[in-house]
Amino acid sequence: MRSGGEQQAARVALIVWGALVFGAWSGCAWFGRTAPPTWIEGSSKEYAAEQYLTGVGQAESQPEAASRAYAAVSRIFKAEIRAQSKDWESFLVLEKRGTASTERRLTLDQVTNVSTDKVLDNVRLLDTWKDPKSGRHYALAGMDRAQAGAAMQEKIGELDREVQTDLHESRQTQDKLTAVRTLRRALKHLVLREAYNADLRVIRTSGQGIEPPHRVAELTTQLEQVMASNLVVGVDVAGDEADAVRRAVMEGLVREGLPVTAHRVGADLPSGKESEGPPLELLVKGTVRMWMLKVPDPRFKYARWCSDFVIVESATQRVVGAVSRGGREGHVTEAEALARAGRVMQQEVVSDLARTLAGYVYGDTVPATVAPPSACALGLREG
């Protein structure tokens, strides 16, 4: 699948190619039409605003003028989407929590690019003109409002049906993770639907869109409630600097929007006794180690660190994710070398665990079937 940037580049290339073809076809008309067309000043009977949504571009070459005309139309839609995005702010803020898994985030730029790419499929080069005195090129790009509006209505209808399907599945399922995943998917579809609705407002001369069946803010609140009531993550760490690493991991998971329990697994509650509140569904457990290396370096001391973690479904004891990392840090003193190793270990472990766990919870990644090699076993052999 092409990225947004690749799709944009391909579309611009097509516009430029169209400009060249258009210019070859209409070249004689350029030199016969010395007076500038009325659309250069923003109004035209031939391309009336009631029927066409247009943008004008000018440049030293015809292809560049056509590309700028296309960009002028694009800016109209992007500006409207950004103006309307405050209505989706609650979910976009939820998506921005943490920094570990940006590849799965739904961002305003992604929403803007996807919806604008769709609507701009209807844009074509309408007219061109070359100033015979200055040699400057002008281009008019635009879309037929009726045709583009019909395409937007169809896409909005598709997304409304997808939202309803996702919500029905989320409410009917007995599986807690499925409830979270389908509700989040419904929200992503709803945000994209509202972006298309913003496009429709631009296309229609009335400025009216289609009323949504659900509000983004309401479903975002539901998602947070479902997460809090159906999912709890426990963290259990053993080894060197275990308490510090455990706190860092818990803080990192909270930043991801994941509900984390402060109870130590197996320590606070007797075996077989149920805790108050939701049951523990996922457990992050692992071991961390740090030790000094014997390196013949008169200036620096070196400390090695390693970590081996698994993410386990508590009910089935099935491993759904694993993270093994290791590294070496140096400094002039042993204390500073160990301190630096501890800081780096926390940063890397938290980042990987947050990304792995969030990917599993939200259904963005397939659970690992084979655990990676033990970083601590490898490190101890090397050290």
Positions of PLM-derived features:
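Bacterial N-terminal signal peptides
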Residues: 13-25
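Surface-exposed short loop/turn segments
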Residues: 91-126, 266-319
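Short secondary-structure boundary motifs at beta->alpha junctions and helix caps
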Residues: 48-64, 166, 172-174, 313-360
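N-terminal segment of the mature soluble domain
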Residues: 70-91, 230-285, 315-319
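Intrinsically disordered, low-complexity charged/polar segments
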Residues: 35-46, 75-142, 363-376
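Bacterial N-terminal signal peptides that target proteins for export
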Residues: 2-16
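A structural "domain/chain start" motif
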Residues: 53-56, 143-144, 152-157, 164-256, ...
